[in-house]
UniProtKB/Swiss-Prot annotation:
Name under which the protein is recorded: NADH-quinone oxidoreductase subunit K
Record-linked NCBIfam families: PRK05715.1-2, PRK05715.1-3, PRK05715.1-4, PRK05715.1-5
Organism: Desulfitobacterium hafniense (strain Y51)
Protein EC: 7.1.1.-
Lineage: Bacteria, Bacillati, Bacillota, Clostridia, Eubacteriales
TM regions (residue ranges): 7-27, 31-51, 73-93
Subunit description: NDH-1 is composed of 14 different subunits. Subunits NuoA, H, J, K, L, M, N constitute the membrane sector of the complex.
Protein family (similarity comment): Belongs to the complex I subunit 4L family.
Amino acid sequence: MSISVGLGSYLLVGAMLFCLGLYGVFVKRNIIAILMSIELMLNAVNINFIAFSRFAPWANPGTNPLIGQVAAIFVIVVAAAEIAVGLALVIAIYRNRRTTNVDEFNWLKW
């Protein structure tokens, strides 16, 4: 008995992971948890890129299209830069305010 996993299965996993990250962004109040949720969303996009690259109509067995893999690596690089800048900002804010709770960030209001 062989079970084949198609494009729909990968897209379902990607959508579930994206929804989980989106839920974390909207519900969590800690900046670090929000950054982790954004990383989940970016990884869901990577899963979709790789799945579309694998199951695309132009992906013949004899060819090796790397469009999805290159896009996924690009998203990983952007995510690494985003997390580095985000954590630097979190550390700077924590040193000044002694909190990482987003509900207490009202110093940009007039």
